[in-house]
């Protein structure tokens, strides 16, 4: 698969990114090189190889929860520019 400048422009639009002409050219080349490398990986013979999600065996190491004293509401809000009834007040984001 070949990455085109149109592909880069489309992805930039979806990500709401404004790219310069130089960035569009540079990213087109970089992404094309990455996909070419991935295509080479597809040529590997993986018959008999067990699919894994990690290259090395990984196990979850859980620990018991510890109840500890909290810093308290007053300390947590001490440097807050604005607060109401024990909560941070932030500017409205959605009208």
From Swiss-Prot:
Respond yes or no to whether keyword Ribosomal protein is given for this record: no
UniProt keywords, alphabetically: ATP-binding, Ligase, Nucleotide-binding, Protein biosynthesis
Single GO BP term: regulation of translational fidelity
EC number from the UniProt entry: 6.3.5.-
Q: Which Pfam families match?
A: GatC
| Catalytic activity, as annotated | L-glutamyl-tRNA(Gln) + L-glutamine + ATP + H2O = L-glutaminyl-tRNA(Gln) + L-glutamate + ADP + phosphate + H(+); L-aspartyl-tRNA(Asn) + L-glutamine + ATP + H2O = L-asparaginyl-tRNA(Asn) + L-glutamate + ADP + phosphate + 2 H(+)
Single annotated GO MF: ATP binding
Signal peptide region: none
Q: Which family does it belong to?
A: Belongs to the GatC family.
Please state what the protein is called: Aspartyl/glutamyl-tRNA(Asn/Gln) amidotransferase subunit C
Which species? Geobacter sulfurreducens (strain ATCC 51573 / DSM 12127 / PCA)
Q: What is the lineage of its organism?
A: Bacteria, Pseudomonadati, Thermodesulfobacteriota, Desulfuromonadia, Geobacterales
